[in-house]
């Protein structure tokens, strides 16, 4: 233990750490042929959990991926999704998932519902998924649909154990993205994983487009059906200030 460790513990008493004092880290993987290779590399690097991250989690490819990981790494924490039904939660849990992500098309920059015709309003999805999660005694994560602190309150009240937040944190200094000046105000760029830019680069596998191996930018953009958009959010300063506002809203709720 060093002085730096003591200062970190004092400044961040609620930091999520493992038994060696390191910040816990999870990593997302797809369901491609290189799944085992990627998970093996992550486990060697000390990952705490892997997330099988797809737009439609209640599918044979995801179920088989969970079974493969659980067979090879029985003690590794597995998060899987996304689903919006009780049946989806049951299927993923029975395959070996420890936690299930809930939400299809709920994100502020996600257009899956209008592009694919699939999805459910987020509060309804959490309420539906929680029926199975409570019976199976597994946590669910509300992924998307959080624009204000009140949305976190509603998600937890509906049955979510926790939530994933994108747009509320996207404008913080600590988040990735370029700072832009637009009409005299500071913004940060923000794009969905299903946007054309992200899918052309690396995330096409998540949406089952099968175009992740296409080489040229023009070929990629011509063969992909985007399920998200790119935009900008106001720069909000330090993430500590943003979280303080969230906590205030949660306490009031």
Task: Name each region found by the language model.
Residues 2-16, 34-38, 54-78, 83-94, ...:
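Active-site-adjacent beta->alpha loops and helix N-cap segments on the catalytic face
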Residues 44-50, 72-76, 94-99, 105, ...:
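Glycine-enriched alpha-helix->loop->beta-strand junction motifs that scaffold or abut catalytic
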Residues 49-54, 141:
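Short acidic catalytic loops
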Residues 28, 95-98, 117-142, 146-253:
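Alpha/beta catalytic cores of nucleotide-metabolism and tRNA/nucleoside-modifying enzymes
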Residues 18-28, 68-84, 99, 132-144:
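Short beta-strand/loop segments at the ligand-binding rim of alpha/beta enzyme cores
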Residues 16-26, 42-49, 73, 106-114:
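Gly-rich Lys/Arg/Thr-decorated short loops/hinges at beta-loop-alpha junctions or inter-strand turns
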Residues 54, 104, 167:
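Short secondary-structure boundary segments
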């Amino acid at each position: 233990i060093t002085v730096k460790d003591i200062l970190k513990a004092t400044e961040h008493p609620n930091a999520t750490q493992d038994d060696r004092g390191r910040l816990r880290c999870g990593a997302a993987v797809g369901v491609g042929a290189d799944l085992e290779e990627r998970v093996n590399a992550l486990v060697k690097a000390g990952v705490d959990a892997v997330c099988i991250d797809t737009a439609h989690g209640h599918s044979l490819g995801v179920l088989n991926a969970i079974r493969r990981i659980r067979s090879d790494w029985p003690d590794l924490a597995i998060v899987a999704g996304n689903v919006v039904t009780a049946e989806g939660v049951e299927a993923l849990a029975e395959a070996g998932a420890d936690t299930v992500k809930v939400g299809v098309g709920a994100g502020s920059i996600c257009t899956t519902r209008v592009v694919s015709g699939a999805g459910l309003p987020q509060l309804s999805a959490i309420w539906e998924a929680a029926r199975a999660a409570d019976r199976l005694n597994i946590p669910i994560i509300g992924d998307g649909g959080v624009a204000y602190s009140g949305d976190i309150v509603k998600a937890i009240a509906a049955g979510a154990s926790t939530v994933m937040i994108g747009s509320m944190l996207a404008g913080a200094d600590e988040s990735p993205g370029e700072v832009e000046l637009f009409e005299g105000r500071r913004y940060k760029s923000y794009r969905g994983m299903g946007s054309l830019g992200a899918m052309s680069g690396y995330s096409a596998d998540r949406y089952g487009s099968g175009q992740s191996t296409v080489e040229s930018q023009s070929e990629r953009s011509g063969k992909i059906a985007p399920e998200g958009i790119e935009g900008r959010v106001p720069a909000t300063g330090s993430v500590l200030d943003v979280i303080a506002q969230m906590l205030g809203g949660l306490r009031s709720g």
